[in-house]
């Protein structure tokens, strides 16, 4: 029905997670477009007329080279669906599926040979950055539940899932089963990731919005007013998504000592209490669009555009790439600091502001102390917050407004004697 398609499209274009992906991480957003396109070409397989496998094959190859994990999940769901409804497919069309699969596998084979090694390297990198990451098999159900949690909060409120069994949806069992199978299989495959981020299941966003649009339509099939009211509530607030979690949040806050026994449980507790909060991401998103966002590095870049000179050297203890590209300064790495040639500028905003330093940064701290002791530097405090991480396209940690902090960035300028910065 066209009205269901309209509802699904409206939910998608007003979805803040999807909008953030399309604006700031288009490679993450590509599966949002490719998934419904792939399923559209797949459904034509069940038509009685002669099936053309070329569109499905082309989209599948493109999809694999874009996001192979989500592609694997969608393909797995499609294969399960095809097995369940194989009786509806003609023998001639079914035989063409094998050829399409062989061509896709052949063109994707170069990547398939290196993926196991690549996944191991990625896993090693993440585990080296944090001791809280679970590398055992138990992470699979944990990650699956986490995907359900994030999806419930921002995409599809699972309190409405029982309405998929409405009598009006019985004729749509073929389509509903395809959408559900692909969603579950994407969640399952994505659980292999080291960290369960919503971006790893972005392919499910259009599928879940189609299911949600079906529920909205058939739940109030005879009342457009109630349909509009439900759509407005889903778009403008997270009340339906989060309200069922509020009692659980209140209980968790009263029993917080049970959840703070380990670092992992503590992080899970803080994430749950932060996310289970009534708010309007849609309103916050428009607040972001109507206010200029000032990142933690913006003021620093503007400062050196005015005061920095070409050829001057600079050491910054975090995110040096930004100044290397956007300023005239010559950047110095921490290991290259020496006493005979002190940098013209020193910026402390990240690693060296941390009271607990690792061995490498501790060595750099000793070098900086010696440089400050033997040279004359003027201290300048910029009206810029000390934030080591810039904004993120992940909705859970995205900042809709400019970050603030009581701690400011310290800039040190080497001078021959006492003088003021002009």
PLM feature segments, named:
Residues 65-66, 71-169:
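Transmembrane-lumen/periplasm boundary regions of multi-pass, lipid-linked membrane glycan transferases
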Residues 58, 102-105, 171-172, 216-265:
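Signature aromatic-anchored transmembrane alpha helix within multi-pass, membrane-resident enzymes
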